[in-house]
Amino acid sequence: MASCTETPIEAPASIAGDDDAILGELVHLARAGGGRGLLQFESLVSAHQYRDLYPLFRAYVPKGAEVLDWGAGNGHFSYFLLRSGYSVCAFALHDEGFEAWRPKGPYRFVPGTPSDPVTLPLPDASFDAVASVGVLEHVRETGGEEAASLREIVRVLRPGGLFVCWHLPNRWSWIEAIADRLPGKHHHAYRFSVSQIDALLTAAGLERVLLRRYGFLPRNLWGRSFLRGLGQRRAVARAWDALDHVLGWGFSIACQNLAFVARKPRTDAP
């Protein structure tokens, strides 16, 4: 997967074998119908859109940390968190049944209120990290607002805690630009520039420590029936990753997604 870093960091320690195993398990669950709505995992190529997220998260958030999976959806990131030794609290407006197929580990689900989609029914300073995996860009669609959601996230983070945001649509994405013009094609209604992200983080009192662009090539199309078989091959997935990385490095401004890590200050400002 393309990894277009704007704020350089030391390469994170990778646990590639574990990551590949987790992705493989999710692909198997998607194909077997064991995981509800795992559309992103209908092929190995599409599943690899998360392959860079796993080591990135581990690099910043130590094993055993208490993590809020904010907007947990079908539970795929909670699955990774549990398999990786984190203590997980999943928040979503609707329960999609992850409890029925989740791996073992410390886990609880906290439902939200559709009439009040912003408020987190959780105590202040409850978590070492909060993860948003394809969620922040959708809050307005459910009646929320990004700035208000970020204030709630800051409230439930402990001092020094981290907000890890993945799959935030890039305002200048070529994929989104084309999808926006194709009738019936899914695209994101809200996309973000770096300056917009920084303004939101500053207003919420968060300090950005990492920003990267990634994902030049499309992924989810490999889950379609005519490509699914080919997309299950590991060699094809690795080749697509390599091409994605090269094109993403050369044309980073047009990558589909943005990711960032931001920190809540360790002490309150005087």
Predicted features by range, described:
Residues 76, 80, 138, 174:
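Phosphate- and divalent-cation-binding pockets in alpha/beta enzyme and binding domains
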Residues 111, 140-152, 162-266:
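S-adenosyl-L-methionine-dependent methyltransferase catalytic module, highlighting the catalytic core
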